[in-house]
């Protein structure tokens, strides 16, 4: 079960990013430092009380300007709202209501997503109430005064947010497996879709950029339904025309987020390019299960060692995806194409898998016995109290510790490797949230979101 999404909306310079940092704290997903893998963070995990969710900062929203990149931001905001359970509209309490705020409010009132109005930069409780009252006329309900920098007032706002977030048991498991077929232009995605479905639904052409929209096809095998989503090829930004193709790429990114499993298609003749690495980082950031589909295998001269040599070369570049299945296929001849769905079944099952708290703590106990947590220069040692799985799709495990800052990146990677070694989660990324002991102690700061 994936975490519900909360979209953070607002014009530029009202403190949206500061607010997102307040909610997410140190919980940003750990990524590798290989050049080209990471990109600017948009989706970040957050939690309040007993509820986990994701927040997405959509960028500064402006409606009366069509200069470069502003249309993208508006499109990103639309896409975020389409998948969000709720939206938080952030305004500047010190500046007061502006014409841009009113335009955004009018747009939000036309959406079906519930909206919570956050009046930021209210540093004084008494003055904040006065500042917030000026925003009643926007027609979005009660304005909540708060300070993203200091955290005051965020508790009341987040309590209101929880009313719109579904409890985990309210979201039923879906029988259908959603599979996004993604990759650079002209690596054979549409040919692969046609081979899997047996139909010429997508336009197959050697001209890069032929597929502009996300195309859904439903196939059934052995009683299991698969929704296959072909997408526009992901290319470097400098090569993108900010027209139909740009929005096609945005839809491709959205397809990744709505998928259970991503078929990451690579051209064996090209190997792993820099753009492939960036796309791989995007897939991991969105927490999708992955099958690495190496296409055009029919074009390679082979002997008994060729497949092992290519696997080694590819994984040297995609080492951060060493948990994903890699399958060599030919969409043109059909070689091993049907075996792809076997890999999808395994990845989807692992992506949805839930492990008991007892098993998680057995793994932690053994890991700590082999390698104790690090000690700071001041002689203070990290301590892991316990761990528990908080969500699936992807599997996310919260580790409650005395101080997250006492656990360096090396030790965090060690713990993740132990979970991989003992629990598998083959084909799926996993996320570890390191939470301080004080996170659940709300008595001292009931109206303040706590960074950890």
From Swiss-Prot:
Protein name as catalogued: GTPase Der
Cross-referenced HAMAP family: GTPase_Der
Role summary: GTPase that plays an essential role in the late steps of ribosome biogenesis.
Coiled-coil ranges per UniProt: none
Pfam families per the UniProt record, alphabetical: KH_dom-like (PF14714), MMR_HSR1 (PF01926)
InterPro entries (UniProt xref): AAA+_ATPase (IPR003593), G_ENGA (IPR031166), GTP-bd (IPR006073), GTPase_Der (IPR016484), KH_dom-like (IPR032859), KH_dom-like_a/b (IPR015946), P-loop_NTPase (IPR027417), Small_GTP-bd (IPR005225)
GO molecular function, one term: ATP hydrolysis activity
Residues noted as binding GTP 1 in the record, renumbered to the chain: 10-17, 57-61, 120-123
Species of origin: Synechocystis sp. (strain ATCC 27184 / PCC 6803 / Kazusa)
Oligomeric and partner information: Associates with the 50S ribosomal subunit.
Manganese in keyword set: no
Residues that hold GTP 2 according to the record: 183-190, 230-234, 295-298
Keywords: GTP-binding, Nucleotide-binding, Repeat, Ribosome biogenesis
PROSITE patterns: G_ENGA
Domain KH-like residue range list: 353-439
Family: Belongs to the TRAFAC class TrmE-Era-EngA-EngB-Septin-like GTPase superfamily. EngA (Der) GTPase family.
Annotated EngA-type G domain residues: 4-169, 177-352
